[in-house]
Amino acid sequence: MSRTATIKRDTFETQIELTLDLDEQTPIKVDTGIGYIDHMLTLFAKHGRFGLQVDVKGDLQVDSHHTTEDIGIVLGEAFTQALGDKVGIERYGAQFVPMDETLTRAVIDLSGRSYLVLHAELTAPTLGTFETEVVEDFWQGFADQARANVHIEVLYGRNTHHKIESMFKAVGRAMRQAITINPEIKGVNSTKGRI
């Protein structure tokens, strides 16, 4: 069974085409028009061992908010579609990722219920032209459309770039753990019989 998804989203603010492959590390190609987000999505895919292609045209003349949030929405939707009925998946993932002086923890539950908890003090308001406050909007869109509990906590650190980068790496690794198929799991990993 192929666990892949291609999602297209067209609004007055963004045009996004995203292809996700959960099991094959196809070449990672990301072009969002925002260099920092390109870097973060590439890290997410590399450390999660996902195939990922993303092409975005956004209203960057306004700012990076719509583009960043909509990418999170589409990425979450792609995970939901690629996972299908979630039969046999671990469901949970938890990872700690250090980056120099920073340590971040990410914990995921692919429960079918959306919830985001994000604890991170991002002291730099921008990185280049990227507004760091939209990182939370990205993860909210992702959690909502992946229908997942997403808990991200930067435990400590100084550098805002390192904090955000460790988030993307930690969530990528936690998602890899959560989507892994375990042959010992019969059906779905829930007493309800569905997730």
UniProtKB/Swiss-Prot annotation:
It is found in: Cytoplasm. Its EC number is 4.2.1.19. Keywords: Amino-acid biosynthesis, Cytoplasm, Histidine biosynthesis, Lyase. The keyword Cell wall biogenesis/degradation does not apply. It catalyses: D-erythro-1-(imidazol-4-yl)glycerol 3-phosphate = 3-(imidazol-4-yl)-2-oxopropyl phosphate + H2O. It comes from the Bacteria. InterPro entries: IGPD_sf (IPR038494), ImidazoleglycerolP_deHydtase (IPR000807), ImidazoleglycerP_deHydtase_CS (IPR020565), Ribosomal_Su5_D2-typ_SF (IPR020568). One of its GO terms (cellular component) is cytoplasm. Pathway: Amino-acid biosynthesis; L-histidine biosynthesis; L-histidine from 5-phospho-alpha-D-ribose 1-diphosphate: step 6/9. This is Imidazoleglycerol-phosphate dehydratase. It comes from Leuconostoc mesenteroides subsp. mesenteroides (strain ATCC 8293 / DSM 20343 / BCRC 11652 / CCM 1803 / JCM 6124 / NCDO 523 / NBRC 100496 / NCIMB 8023 / NCTC 12954 / NRRL B-1118 / 37Y). The lineage of its organism: Bacteria, Bacillati, Bacillota, Bacilli, Lactobacillales.
